[in-house]
Amino acid sequence: MNQLLNKIANIPFVWNTAQNIIGANQWKSSMYPSAVDAKEGTLLDFGCSSGNETAMFLSFDYYGIDVDAPAIEAAKKKFRAYSNVKFYTVDIIKEGFKKDFFDHVLFAGTAHHLSDAELGKVFRILLDNLKPGGQLHFIDPISQPEKDVWRTRFIIGADQGKNVRTEEVYRKFFSEQSVQVTQWKIFPNPYRFIRFPDFLYVRVIK
């Protein structure tokens, strides 16, 4: 039964509709552009899925990548009218991508789908994708045991990504990467009933 539900949830239209109903996409549409305050240049969206956040970055030369081929095909259809928007099915750990090419890399909402080993590998690869002086924008939900109410814990437990980490874990992770962190910010959940976990934003300069 769980496998069937997961397959249904992974259908791009179903997933996007669910995100709209519970307000997740609306929150991201205000959070992501406020974090990535630039308006132009080359931008890599790692783990773009079916392009749920792509519309926020149409002023960029936008590249979206994901391992999920059906989601990428859905994204291509959705944004086929935009010549500056491109999507690719890529396993970045196995294949890599454009090195020293991007002004911005968006690493958003995907880290909790990665194991610790995968997180380290992906982070270093994404840094390699940046031009010197480029910016990596890391955004991911965090677990806060001292704050999270049962509704938040339920959402975290129901998420397909099983590696929601604490802020302390990420502080240790980024300190071990020997990178220049220029911004560290918590985006609190804006809703009173649907208690999403708060999101951590970290800006890194290559």
Predicted segments — roles?
Residues 106:
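A conserved beta-strand element that flanks and buttresses the S-adenosyl-L-methionine
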Residues 1-43, 48-96, 114-120, 137-206:
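Class I (Rossmann-like) S-adenosyl-L-methionine-dependent methyltransferase catalytic domain
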Residues 120-132:
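A short glycine-rich, Lys/Arg-flanked "PGG" loop and its adjoining helix->strand segment in the class I
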Residues 109-113:
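Short catalytic micro-motifs in class I SAM-dependent methyltransferases
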Residues 40, 102-103:
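Local beta-strand N-terminus motif with an aromatic residue
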